[in-house]
C-alpha cells in the first residue's frame, strides 16, 4: 500500500480557485491557482458562473498534483475552504445551475432586507442566526433566485432543485451528485440556520419561502463526507474530510481554538474573529455571532467584525492617487516620516463596517496643514487599517469580557512590518505573524487531516505552528490613547456624509 504522504486543501475564493498540497510537517509542497470571471449584470450586482467555479477548482486539483509529481493514492484527504455566503441553486438530476451564483458582495436583495426590517424581524434574526439583516448573507439570495426563475419554487418543493454555498456545490460535483452536505460554519452564514439549535430555522425558511427539501445536510467541519477520484494519476478514491468557510478556516489554521484567541486577516478588507468557546455571545456592539471550529471540528462560536477597506485603501493610494507605484512601496514611504503630522485618513469609500455600520460615511482626510506631504498621507492610510482593527477589537472585548493577550495575523498586508508594528502599538498587545502565510488553506488541511488520522490531535499541530515574528507595543499608554482619540474624532466627522437629512 502506498504511504499517504500529503493533504490537499482546495481554497475556492472570490476571484480565484486554488489548490495547495501540504506534507505532514505542514510545509507547502505545491500550489496551483486559476482566476475566473467576475460578472456584473447591473450596478451593485455580482455573479459567478458555477460551472466556471467548478472547472477552475477541479483543474487546479489535477494541476497541483502534476506539478508536485504526486499520484492520488499518496493523498490522505482533501479539505475545502471557500468564499462564504455565495449562493448556488442547481438541478438535482442534471447538476446544472438554474442561475448564476449570486456572490456575497451582491447588493440586489437590499429591498428584501428592508422588508424584513419593516416586518420587525431584525431581533429574531440576530437572536437566532447571529447575523444582521443584510444582502451579504445567502438567504435573501436564494429567495431572489426562486422569485425570478420561473417555476423554480415548485420544483424545489418537489425536491428537484438543490441549494448550496460553494463548499456544497464543490462536494456535489466531486462526488458525482452523491453527497449534498455543508458544514456548520458555512450554514451559519446563510441567515437560514439557527446557531443555537444547530438546525435550519423553520421560521426563516417560512419568511423567505425557501423549501427545506432543497437544503443540504449540515455536518461537523472535520469528518469524512464522501470520496472523490477526480485528479491525480491513479484512480484512487480520496476522502473529502474537512470543510470550513474561509475566515473560520483561517481561525483554525492559526490554531485559535481556545476561548479568547483571535486572528485578523488583512486582505482587501479585514476580517477579525475571536473564538468564544462553547458560548454564543450576542453582540451589543455591531459584531456578528457566528460558528467556528472547535479543537476537533466540533461547534465553537466566534464574534466576527469586518472592516471594508484595508488593502483596498493601499490600492487607492496606488491606482487613484498615484502616490505609490506598488503596494509594497507603502512601507518605505511611511517610514520616511516620523509620524503623520496630525493627519488622519478615514477610508470609508463604501461606508463603514463593524462596529459602526454606517453606509452613508465617506472617505476623508483630516488635519491637513501646509507641512503635510505625500509620505504623511501614505503613513496615515496605513495607520487607518490598524485603527479600524482596534475599533473591532474594542467591540469584541466589550461583548465577550475577554482581554486579548495576542493577535494572530495573516493575509497579504502582514508582510508590511511598519503596519504590524503600528498595529501592536495601537492595540497595546502582541501581534504574532506565522511562518506559514497560507493559513486559510492550512485550516482546511488541518480539519481534513485530523478527520482521517493523518494528524492525531491539536498538540501535534501546535508543534508545527511557528511564529515567524512577534511585534510588541513600543509606545506608552498615554500616547496610544491620544492617537486613538484623534482617530475617533475623524471617524465621527466622516459619518453620515451622504445622508443629507443629518
Curated annotation (Swiss-Prot):
Key words of the record: Allosteric enzyme, ATP-binding, Glycerol metabolism, Kinase, Metal-binding, Nucleotide-binding, Transferase, Zinc
GO molecular function ontology, one term from the record: ATP binding
Gene Ontology cellular component terms for the protein in this record: cytosol
Top-level division of the source organism's lineage: Bacteria
Residues that hold ADP according to the record: 14, 18, 268, 311, 412, 416
GO biological process entries: glycerol catabolic process; glycerol metabolic process; glycerol-3-phosphate metabolic process
Regulation: Activity of this regulatory enzyme is affected by several metabolites. Allosterically and non-competitively inhibited by fructose 1,6-bisphosphate (FBP) and unphosphorylated phosphocarrier protein EIIA-Glc (III-Glc), an integral component of the bacterial phosphotransferase (PTS) system.
Keyword Coiled coil part of the UniProt annotation: no
Binding site for sn-glycerol 3-phosphate: 14, 84-85, 136, 246
Enzyme class: transferase
Residue positions binding ATP: 14-16, 268, 311, 315, 412
Metabolic or biological pathway: Polyol metabolism; glycerol degradation via glycerol kinase pathway; sn-glycerol 3-phosphate from glycerol: step 1/1
EC number: 2.7.1.30
Keyword Transmembrane: no
Binding site for glycerol: 84-85, 136, 246-247
Catalytic activity: glycerol + ATP = sn-glycerol 3-phosphate + ADP + H(+)
Family of this protein: Belongs to the FGGY kinase family.
Subunit structure: Homotetramer and homodimer (in equilibrium). Heterodimer with EIIA-Glc. Binds 1 zinc ion per glycerol kinase EIIA-Glc dimer. The zinc ion is important for dimerization.
NCBIfam families reported for this sequence: glycerol_kin (TIGR01311), PRK00047.1 (NF000756)
HAMAP family with a match to the protein in the record: Glycerol_kin
Role this protein plays: Key enzyme in the regulation of glycerol uptake and metabolism. Catalyzes the phosphorylation of glycerol to yield sn-glycerol 3-phosphate.
Protein name stated in the entry: Glycerol kinase
Gene source species: Salmonella agona (strain SL483)
Amino acid at each position: 500500500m502506498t504511504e499517504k504522504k500529503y493533504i490537499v486543501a482546495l481554497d475556492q475564493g472570490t476571484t480565484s480557485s486554488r489548490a495547495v498540497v501540504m506534507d505532514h510537517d505542514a510545509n507547502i509542497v505545491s500550489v496551483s491557482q486559476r482566476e475566473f470571471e467576475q460578472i456584473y449584470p447591473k450596478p451593485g450586482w455580482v455573479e459567478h458562473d458555477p460551472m466556471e467555479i467548478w472547472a477552475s477548482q477541479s483543474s487546479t486539483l489535477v494541476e497541483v498534483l502534476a506539478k508536485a509529481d504526486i499520484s492520488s493514492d499518496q493523498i490522505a484527504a482533501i479539505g475545502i475552504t471557500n468564499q462564504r455566503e455565495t449562493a448556488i441553486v442547481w438541478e438535482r438530476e442534471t447538476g446544472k445551475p438554474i442561475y448564476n451564483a449570486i456572490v456575497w458582495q451582491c447588493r440586489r436583495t437590499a429591498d428584501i432586507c428592508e422588508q424584513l426590517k419593516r416586518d420587525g424581524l431584525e431581533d429574531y434574526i440576530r437572536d437566532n442566526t447571529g447575523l444582521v439583516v443584510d444582502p451579504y448573507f445567502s438567504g435573501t439570495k436564494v429567495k431572489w433566485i426562486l422569485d425570478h426563475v420561473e417555476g423554480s419554487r415548485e420544483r424545489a418543493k418537489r425536491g428537484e432543485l438543490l441549494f448550496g454555498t460553494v463548499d456544497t456545490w464543490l462536494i456535489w460535483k466531486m462526488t458525482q451528485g452523491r453527497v449534498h452536505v455543508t458544514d456548520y460554519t458555512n450554514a451559519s452564514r446563510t441567515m437560514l440556520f439557527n446557531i443555537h439549535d444547530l438546525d435550519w430555522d423553520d421560521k426563516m425558511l417560512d419568511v423567505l419561502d425557501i423549501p427545506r427539501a432543497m437544503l443540504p445536510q449540515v455536518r461537523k467541519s472535520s469528518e469524512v463526507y464522501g470520496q472523490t477520484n477526480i485528479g491525480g494519476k491513479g484512480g484512487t478514491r480520496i476522502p473529502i474530510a474537512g470543510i470550513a468557510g474561509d475566515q473560520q478556516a483561517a481561525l483554525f489554521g492559526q490554531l485559535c481554538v481556545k476561548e479568547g484567541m483571535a486572528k485578523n486577516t488583512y486582505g482587501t478588507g479585514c476580517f477579525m474573529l475571536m473564538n468564544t468557546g462553547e458560548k454564543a455571545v450576542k453582540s451589543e456592539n455591531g459584531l456578528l455571532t457566528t460558528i467556528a471550529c472547535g479543537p476537533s471540528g466540533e461547534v465553537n462560536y466566534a464574534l466576527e467584525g469586518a472592516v471594508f477597506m484595508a488593502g483596498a485603501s493601499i490600492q487607492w493610494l496606488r491606482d487613484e492617487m498615484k502616490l505609490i507605484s506598488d503596494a509594497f512601496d507603502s512601507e518605505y514611504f511611511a517610514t520616511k516620516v516620523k509620524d503623520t503630522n496630525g493627519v488622519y485618513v478615514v477610508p470609508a469609500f463604501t461606508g463603514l463596517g463593524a462596529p459602526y455600520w454606517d453606509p452613508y460615511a465617506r472617505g476623508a482626510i483630516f488635519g491637513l496643514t501646509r507641512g503635510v506631504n505625500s509620505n504623511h498621507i501614505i503613513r496615515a492610510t496605513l495607520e487607518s487599517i490598524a485603527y479600524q482593527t482596534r475599533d473591532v477589537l474594542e467591540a469584541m472585548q466589550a461583548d465577550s469580557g475577554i482581554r486579548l493577550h495576542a493577535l494572530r495575523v495573516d493575509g497579504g498586508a502582514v508582510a508590511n512590518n511598519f503596519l504590524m508594528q503600528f498595529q501592536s502599538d495601537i492595540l497595546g498587545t502582541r501581534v504574532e505573524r506565522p511562518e506559514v502565510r497560507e493559513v486559510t488553506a492550512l485550516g482546511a488541511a488541518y480539519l481534513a487531516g485530523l478527520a482521517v488520522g493523518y494528524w492525531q490531535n491539536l498538540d501535534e499541530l501546535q508543534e508545527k505552528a511557528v511564529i515567524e515574528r512577534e511585534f510588541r507595543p513600543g509606545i506608552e499608554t498615554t500616547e496610544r490613547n491620544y492617537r486613538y482619540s484623534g482617530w475617533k474624532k475623524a471617524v465621527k466627522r466622516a459619518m453620515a456624509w451622504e445622508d443629507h437629512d443629518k
